[in-house]
Amino acid sequence: DFSGKTFKPVWQWNHNPNDKMWSLNKERKGWLRLHSMPAKQLLWAKNTLTQRAIGPVSYTSVKLDASRLKVGDEAGLGAINAPYASLGVVKTDKGLNLRCYDQNTNKEVWKPLAKSKVVWLRLWGDYDKSQLQYSYSLDGKNWENIGEQMLSPYQLKTFQGVRVALYAFNKKELNGGVAD
């Protein structure tokens, strides 16, 4: 989806974008680059790129290069709804970690990324049954579930259904690094 000069029409920004804080094929050929900006959580993160989840059942997979994240950054694959869910890579002072979060239960699962700075993230959704499951891969072929299966119920707060989201933000209220 990100090999051209413009986004395909299916993609939309979740907020008004800051055009200085993202690039498509300019800073790194063949990649979308998101510069992290301050936000406390995914729903407040600017420059979050979204599209409606394809149903009734689908997978969304992304390759994430987290090598240029800075401490406090989180970048990943979200499921925007009310409640939302996410699987991201978080940079702490001890290194990179996967963080799977379910706002519905307020549970999070952390897993250290030992040496890998590149990870594939996947969201499985059965949108008729309101079920989501995240998984990850270190090679793009072998996938391991992370966290429990989540509920993403139909609700009337946002009228949008689940929107798959690519995001990067910094919880330390700083402009951070970049996610490709």
Where are these regions (language model features)?
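Extracellular glycan-recognition regions
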Residues: 1-180
